[in-house]
Amino acid sequence: MHYLRIYFFLFISIASALTIAGQDDPIKIDSSIVRLNVGVVDQRGRPITSLDRTSFAIYEDGIKQEISRFEASTAPFSVVMLLDMSGSTKSFRPNIKLSAARFLDALAPDDRVAVVEFYSKVNLLSDFSADKRLAAQSIELANGQGETNLYKALQFALERLSNERTRRKAIVVLTDGVDTNARNDDRKILSSKPESEMATALKAESSGAFNKLLRDADLQGVTIYPLALPTGDPKRLADPTPLQFALYDNSRRRLQLIADRTGGRLNAINRLEEMGKLYAIVAADLRTLYTIEYDPSNDKHDGQWRTVKIEVPGTELIARSRQGYFAR
């Protein structure tokens, strides 16, 4: 009966995922509100978690903004765990599952977690719940092969998070970073270039799907933490051609841009043994973030970049968050 329950759970999870993932509804958020997840450290890099609303000053394009909502670092998160189950990860799946399960143990009791696997498909294995045992069971069921549908998975995660209303939001994505569709598009660009120009021919922002997920992350104030597997590291390729190096390098730069634009951090996994430690670092970082919202004094939706700066006046503390957004 135990195995029957497991297989029934797997069937229901994947069946519902195929239905949900097939939807292409736009994310609807009150885009006039800017949400920032903010980490604060001292000069030695130690997290500061005892600040309140009056400790912060927010500037947009140099103009001070009025904080409309503030949540302390103890407020719960809604987190999507994205697990790369493409063919390139097959040889170390046990490491992935063990490390991901330990990440759950490091979260706060009220944090809600959803688990999503991606490869050629994107499957919701378990929806948001504070029941970490359910999430752990879902991680064990993760399996797949084939291509890497990374950007579709991130977009799907953002769509799920849009239903989490006013909760603090984050995505933790374990991947080599090489999205198959974007790589194929990059290859087409490079096909007309001589090898001497390939290293500088690609731009991270050249992918439409990539740019859309950045915009949607902006709208919700979602912080994204990529955990980059060594199989996607261009420096680890064995005697790569200029084309191969350019493709992998652009994929890794996109992961870095995702982290930078959303206020997260890119954690490169150099050895598989480090995976659990880096998951723990991400969990610890989530527990130190404040969430701040403001209604911009510039109410134009002109698509222009707005630079955001966060200060903790009268101190030498350092605040980290996303550096801005496009006003759409």
Identify the function of each model-found stretch.
Residues I20-R328:
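Scaffold/interface architecture of coatomer-like assemblies
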Residues Y7-A17:
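Bacterial N-terminal signal peptides
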Residues M1-I6:
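Positively charged n-region of N-terminal signal peptides that target proteins for export
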